[in-house]
């Protein structure tokens, strides 16, 4: 079964908690804190695999979880990191965030990977919080939660050439003639119910050809499942319109207009792609009678054309030469991606420091600062030592000054991470609300 759309849930592993421990050894009378850090949670990674050709597996399993990090241990032992979860999808899969609609990745090559959910960092053990004035810290950080999200997967076949035509135009026969594909072929319409891919090997180039199931009028509205298939030609370099010269109901002239209309109504950009017209079944007597009339029409269209018989192999090499020409032109025009430059730009972007801000939503003030929010969520702020550590951090980070500038009153509440505080102007500090 060919399935090209799926919705899945992914959850990265939570980070392990930091450990609260102290050295208790026979010859170490004043053993200090020795709590190890928690391990990092595993990431969820999606990887393109050329051996897959459908998203069918995701209709049976929709929820995916990476391994959580182990908790830290005594003697400064770090917890083991959680294993990454690698989910394999066909080459040509697009990944969208369901909530935002954002395109996260377009996996167009074998082995290409993207992290779709990052594992949480492990919490620091109490050994990190020892100072000259706090020699026995009885607190540690909790591990961060791993990211979670719903994803929408959409497979768009990666083909250089797309074969288009009305039902029974002979596309499957043509594909089997020019490539290694073995599609189902029968003398009745709608034999092809899913897209078929074939590989064409020429002397100095190899390219892929997709046989798109027969389109009918209204395909852009998903009549005859047309909308399901039209999107598979969006990546192609050239479109080949396979028209049946022997069709009396939809002769080539009418069939061509139907196909163009459906492409335009689905996406006008599709008509900007190079086109080739292949007039098929010229081996039939009724088709041969119409060749002069069809050729006169083709000359006025100004589109490269070939009269062929996919069944008998007539003029197939001429058609392949045209396909090859457009595929080569497309591949030569693809710009070279400056990967190193992109990586450097990404590094510079990551260096930008987030500026804390505080906003009011209804009666509640909310601090927007990932670092401070993250620290609050990692600590048990009902632990006096942990709360004192957090307050000192908030002062160093400039959060208290920010609250002063916002002119927040003593009775107003401030949300930082998962905790709610009240500002004490007398002490210029924060008080945790129980």
Curated annotation (Swiss-Prot):
Q: Which residues form the OCT domain?
A: 347-425
Annotated GTP binding lies at 165-172, 190-194, 211-214, 280-283, 309-311
Q: Can you supply a Gene Ontology BP term from the record?
A: ribosome biogenesis
Q: Which parts of the sequence belong to the OBG-type G domain? A: 159-328
Q: Which GO terms describe its cellular component?
A: cytoplasm
Instruction: Give the Gene Ontology MF terms in alphabetical order.
Output: GTP binding; GTPase activity; magnesium ion binding
The EC number(s) attached to this protein equal: 3.6.5.-
Describe its function: An essential GTPase which binds GTP, GDP and possibly (p)ppGpp with moderate affinity, with high nucleotide exchange rates and a fairly low GTP hydrolysis rate. Plays a role in control of the cell cycle, stress response, ribosome biogenesis and in those bacteria that undergo differentiation, in morphogenesis control.
Name the PANTHER family for this protein.
Answer: DEVELOPMENTALLY REGULATED GTP-BINDING PROTEIN-RELATED (PTHR11702), MITOCHONDRIAL RIBOSOME-ASSOCIATED GTPASE 2 (PTHR11702:SF31)
Put simply, this protein is called GTPase Obg
């Amino acid at each position: 079964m060919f399935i090209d759309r799926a919705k899945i849930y992914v959850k990265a592993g939570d980070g392990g908690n930091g450990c609260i421990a102290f050295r208790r050894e026979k010859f170490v009378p004043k053993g200090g804190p020795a709590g190890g850090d928690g391990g990092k949670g595993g990431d969820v990674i999606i990887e393109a695999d050329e051996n897959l050709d459908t998203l069918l597996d995701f209709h049976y399993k929709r929820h995916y979880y990476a391994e959580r990090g182990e908790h830290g241990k005594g003697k400064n032992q770090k917890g083991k990191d959680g294993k990454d979860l690698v989910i394999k999808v066909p080459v040509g899969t697009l990944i969208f965030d369901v909530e935002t609609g954002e395109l996260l990745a377009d996996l167009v090559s074998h082995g290409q990977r993207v992290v779709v959910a990052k594992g949480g960092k492990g919490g620091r053990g109490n050994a990190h919080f020892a100072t000259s004035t706090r020699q026995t810290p009885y607190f540690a950080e909790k591990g961060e939660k791993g990211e979670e999200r719903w994803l929408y997967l959409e497979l768009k076949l990666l083909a250089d050439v797309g074969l288009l035509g009305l039902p029974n135009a002979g596309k499957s026969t043509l594909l089997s003639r020019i490539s290694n594909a073995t599609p189902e072929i029968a003398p009745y319409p709608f034999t092809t119910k899913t897209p078929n891919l074939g590989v064409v090997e020429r002397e100095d180039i190899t390219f892929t050809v997709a046989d798109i199931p027969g389109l009918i009028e209204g395909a852009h509205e998903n009549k005859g499942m047309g909308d399901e298939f039209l999107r598979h030609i969006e990546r192609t370099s050239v479109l080949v319109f396979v028209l049946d010269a022997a069709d009396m109901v939809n002769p080539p002239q009418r069939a061509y207009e139907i196909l163009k209309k459906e492409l335009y109504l689905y996406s006008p950009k599709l008509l900007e792609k190079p086109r080739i017209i292949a007039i098929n079944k010229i081996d039939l007597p009724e088709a041969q009678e119409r060749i002069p009339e069809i050729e006169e029409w083709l000359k006025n269209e100004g589109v490269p054309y070939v009269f062929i018989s996919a069944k008998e192999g007539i003029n197939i090499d001429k058609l392949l030469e045209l396909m090859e020409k457009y595929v080569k032109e497309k591949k030569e025009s693809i710009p070279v991606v400056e990967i190193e430059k992109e990586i450097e730009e990404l590094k510079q972007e990551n260096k930008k420091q987030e500026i804390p801000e505080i906003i009011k939503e209804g009666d509640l003030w909310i601090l927007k600062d990932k670092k401070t929010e993250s620290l609050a969520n990692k600590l048990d702020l009902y632990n006096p030592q942990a709360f004192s550590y957090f307050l000192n951090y908030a002062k160093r980070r400039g959060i208290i000054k920010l609250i002063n500038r916002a002119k927040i009153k003593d009775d107003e509440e401030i949300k930082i991470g998962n905790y709610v505080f009240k500002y004490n102007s007398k002490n210029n500090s924060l008080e945790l609300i129980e």
